[in-house]
Regions:
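Residue-level signal for well-ordered, solvent-exposed loop/turn and beta-edge residues enriched
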Residues: 5-6
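Active-site beta-loop-alpha junctions of metal-dependent nucleic acid enzymes
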Residues: 10-34
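C-terminal domain-tail junction helix/linker
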Residues: 58-62, 84-135
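RNase H-like polynucleotidyl transferase catalytic core
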Residues: 40-44, 58-77, 94-97
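Short, acidic, Ser/Thr-enriched surface-loop or helix-capping motifs
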Residues: 1-2
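Acidic/histidine-rich, metal-coordinating catalytic segments
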Residues: 34-49, 68, 123-127
């Protein structure tokens, strides 16, 4: 969520594909129940440009916005999140199974990242606190 940098939906998979993108967006929409016309900004990955994903967005009143090809600065907030995820989580641990990885990823995203880790962009507030303040 761009407002407070909060992770709204996060899924792990060995394949980045349209089904993963749709399922993740479905979870986000169920959790937040946003107004029609909410903007989903992404890169131009195949999973986001697929007709199936475009139809899913249209059906759910999600307006797609995409960064220019080869320009990660257009999607800087997500790029920063993935950098944080790698350096504060993924590179620090060894996971014995995908189930353990999924569990620990859930704890990091929805626990530490959203409720414990402050962000400069939020004036030192956690993503959760920033969302509560904005509401």
């Amino acid at each position: 969520d761009l407002c407070g940098r909060e992770v709204v939906a996060s899924l792990n998979s060995s394949h980045i594909d349209t089904e993963l993108a749709k399922e993740t967006l479905k979870i986000a929409l169920e959790r937040r129940k946003p107004a029609k016309g909410i903007i989903l900004h992404s890169d131009q990955g195949r999973q986001f440009t697929a007709k199936e994903f475009n139809k899913f967005c249209d059906k759910n009143y999600v307006q797609q916005s995409m960064s220019k090809a080869g320009c990660p600065y257009d999607n800087a907030v997500m790029e920063r999140f993935y950098n944080t995820l790698k350096h504060e989580f993924y590179y620090l641990y060894k996971f014995d199974s995908n189930d353990i990885l999924d569990q620990k990823l859930y704890e990091f995203d929805y626990g530490k990242y959203n409720h414990v880790r402050p962000h400069r962009a939020n004036g030192g507030l956690t993503p959760y606190a920033a969302r509560c303040r904005a509401a």
